[in-house]
């Protein structure tokens, strides 16, 4: 994600233009493969597909992966937010946000402002 945002800025995307990443908790390796192969622009590293494939509970692994990516995105300069998507799996979004810690970090920083 970091390299992608850096390339966008180097190419001329002004810093005042907000940039959002699209994330969601996937439920299976099959779903991850489908997104990678069928949705233009989707970046799905094979290691994430493999991790879901090998998980005892792929849906839990999907929530963990989403939480990790959300936390990582929050640390990257130039990423202003995330568009979280999971049709029919809203509880997975809520849990990924909770596990990521981003809501707690945002609340803590707003109380210091």
Predicted features by range, described:
Residues 1-12, 89-99:
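Active-site-adjacent beta->alpha loops and helix N-cap segments on the catalytic face
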Residues 1-4, 21, 78:
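Structured catalytic/translocation cores of nucleotide/phosphate-coupled proteins
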Residues 12-69, 88, 99-113:
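Active-site pocket-lining/capping segments in soluble small-molecule metabolic enzymes
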Residues 18, 81-83:
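Beta-sheet entry/capping signal
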Residues 69-81:
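A structural motif corresponding to the C-terminal end of an alpha-helix
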Residues 83-89:
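Glycine-rich phosphate-binding active-site loops on the catalytic face of alpha/beta enzymes
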